[in-house]
């Protein structure tokens, strides 16, 4: 994953936040998200993995998927995953400190706004709204692999959505005079209007649709080329675009708004 910093030897600072690198990272994350959806679509819904809870040895109750995510995040935290500001855990209360030294990136985000985390909302939306749209109904019993695939999707979606913190910081630095009145008034609606660029959003949706068409085609050597009606896709390209338009982009802007509301604290 490309980091969102670049050298700036002329300014005297070793690193600066770069909008170009943020854009580049967001475009690359589209690839990751589309591929993660394709991988998850290999399995049916397998709802018992995330809906059915059982009592653990600790006395707490957890679904298989929640247990898998919690335990995976603990291991990842111990090797430093969550030392990077673009990574946000789903179960923050579980996260230990890294046991290995990690590279210290400059503090590009505002400290009081750094803690914005909407992963609980992302979790609920993913399992209740998104997942049933792009996987087949059914249960094949392959819950461990399904949970691993769900975690890959969740982390890819979360990373993309929480990049809103970096986007908001760059936009604020570029034009603080535009944002400060709305921030001081704690006016969410005004901030959302400032952050909305419909032409850019449409371009993103079209690019994601094209990537889903390209990455998700069923390749057949004996079929006629150019017959769009016969093409089959592992994930519907229009649905991939819709996921961005109805969930990912709005949630990213929600993170941007929540970040900016704390930017002057």
From Swiss-Prot:
<dbReference type="GO" id="GO:0008652">
    <property type="term" value="P:amino acid biosynthetic process"/>
</dbReference>
<dbReference type="GO" id="GO:0046417">
    <property type="term" value="P:chorismate metabolic process"/>
</dbReference>
<keyword id="KW-0057">Aromatic amino acid biosynthesis</keyword>
<dbReference type="InterPro" id="IPR002701">
    <property type="entry name" value="CM_II_prokaryot"/>
</dbReference>
<protein>
    <recommendedName>
        <fullName>Chorismate mutase 2</fullName>
        <ecNumber>5.4.99.5</ecNumber>
    </recommendedName>
</protein>
<dbReference type="InterPro" id="IPR008238">
    <property type="entry name" value="Chorismate_mutase_AroQ_euk"/>
</dbReference>
<dbReference type="GO" id="GO:0005829">
    <property type="term" value="C:cytosol"/>
</dbReference>
<keyword id="KW-0963">Cytoplasm</keyword>
<keyword id="KW-0028">Amino-acid biosynthesis</keyword>
<feature type="domain" description="Chorismate mutase">
    <location>
        <begin position="10"/>
        <end position="265"/>
    </location>
</feature>
<dbReference type="GO" id="GO:1901747">
    <property type="term" value="P:prephenate(2-) biosynthetic process"/>
</dbReference>
<dbReference type="GO" id="GO:0004106">
    <property type="term" value="F:chorismate mutase activity"/>
</dbReference>
<dbReference type="InterPro" id="IPR036263">
    <property type="entry name" value="Chorismate_II_sf"/>
</dbReference>
<dbReference type="Pfam" id="PF01817">
    <property type="entry name" value="CM_2"/>
</dbReference>
<comment type="pathway">
    <text>Metabolic intermediate biosynthesis; prephenate biosynthesis; prephenate from chorismate: step 1/1.</text>
</comment>
<dbReference type="GO" id="GO:0009073">
    <property type="term" value="P:aromatic amino acid family biosynthetic process"/>
</dbReference>
<keyword id="KW-0413">Isomerase</keyword>
<dbReference type="InterPro" id="IPR037039">
    <property type="entry name" value="CM_AroQ_sf_eucaryotic"/>
</dbReference>
<dbReference type="GO" id="GO:0042803">
    <property type="term" value="F:protein homodimerization activity"/>
</dbReference>
<comment type="subunit">
    <text>Homodimer.</text>
</comment>
């Amino acid at each position: 994953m490309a980091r969102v910093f670049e050298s700036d030897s002329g300014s005297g600072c070793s690193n600066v936040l770069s909008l170009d690198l943020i854009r580049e990272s967001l475009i690359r994350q589209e690839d990751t998200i589309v591929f993660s959806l394709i991988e998850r679509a290999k399995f049916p819904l397998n709802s018992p993995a995330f809906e059915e809870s059982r009592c653990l040895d600790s006395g707490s109750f957890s679904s298989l998927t929640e247990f898998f995510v919690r335990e995976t995040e603990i291991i990842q935290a111990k090797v430093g995953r969550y030392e990077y500001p673009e990574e946000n855990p789903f179960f923050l209360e579980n996260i230990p400190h890294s046991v290995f030294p990690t590279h210290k990136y400059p503090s590009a985000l505002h400290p009081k706004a750094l803690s914005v985390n909407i992963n609980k909302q992302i979790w609920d939306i993913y399992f209740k709204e998104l997942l049933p749209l792009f996987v087949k109904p059914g249960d094949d019993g392959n819950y461990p692999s399904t949970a691993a695939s769900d975690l890959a999707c969740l982390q890819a979606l979360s990373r993309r959505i929480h990049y809103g913190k970096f986007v908001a910081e760059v936009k604020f630095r570029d034009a603080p005079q535009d944002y400060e009145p709305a921030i001081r008034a704690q006016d969410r609606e005004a901030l959302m209007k400032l952050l909305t660029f419909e032409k850019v959003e449409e371009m993103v949706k079209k690019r994601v649709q094209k990537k889903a068409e390209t990455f998700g085609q069923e390749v057949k050597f004996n079929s006629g080329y150019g017959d769009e009606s016969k093409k089959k896709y592992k994930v519907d390209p229009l649905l991939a675009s819709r996921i961005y338009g109805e969930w990912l982009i709005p949630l990213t802007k929600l993170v941007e708004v929540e970040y900016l509301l704390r930017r002057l604290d």
